């Protein structure tokens, strides 16, 4: 997917298909409640592998069994298709 900045309309449309994600300025985030701390770490590991393959990395905050993923394309100065693509992958991995 492209690294061109998405318009507000494009972001809103994409988020309709990503109901667990919320936008705050130039980033989107999702919090996942895992069954346990080891399950949270396993999820982070799966997301890390997907992020490496995509060459695009989320900010990750781990607090016991609660994991928050935040996406933004810092080099572009906001949200791009790469963020939406990785959000979709994170959703699949978090199921």
Curated annotation (Swiss-Prot):
One of its GO terms (molecular function) is 4-alpha-hydroxytetrahydrobiopterin dehydratase activity. GO terms for biological process: tetrahydrobiopterin biosynthetic process. HAMAP family: Pterin_4_alpha (MF_00434). Signal peptide: none annotated. InterPro entries: PCD_sf (IPR036428), Pterin_deHydtase (IPR001533). The keyword Lyase applies. It catalyses: (4aS,6R)-4a-hydroxy-L-erythro-5,6,7,8-tetrahydrobiopterin = (6R)-L-erythro-6,7-dihydrobiopterin + H2O. It comes from Nocardia farcinica (strain IFM 10152). It comes from the Bacteria. Belongs to the pterin-4-alpha-carbinolamine dehydratase family. PANTHER family: PTERIN-4-ALPHA-CARBINOLAMINE DEHYDRATASE. This is Putative pterin-4-alpha-carbinolamine dehydratase. Keywords: Lyase. Its EC number is 4.2.1.96. It is an enzyme of class 4 (lyase). The keyword Lyase applies.
């Amino acid at each position: 997917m492209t690294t061109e900045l998405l318009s507000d309309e494009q972001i809103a449309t994409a988020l309709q298909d990503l109901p667990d994600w919320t936008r705050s300025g130039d980033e989107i985030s999702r919090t996942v409640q895992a069954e346990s701390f080891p399950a949270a770490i396993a999820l982070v590991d799966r997301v890390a592998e997907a992020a490496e393959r995509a060459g695009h990395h989320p900010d990750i905050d781990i607090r016991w069994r609660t994991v928050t993923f935040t996406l933004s394309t810092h080099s572009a100065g906001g949200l791009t298709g790469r963020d939406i693509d990785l959000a979709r992958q994170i959703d699949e991995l978090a199921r």
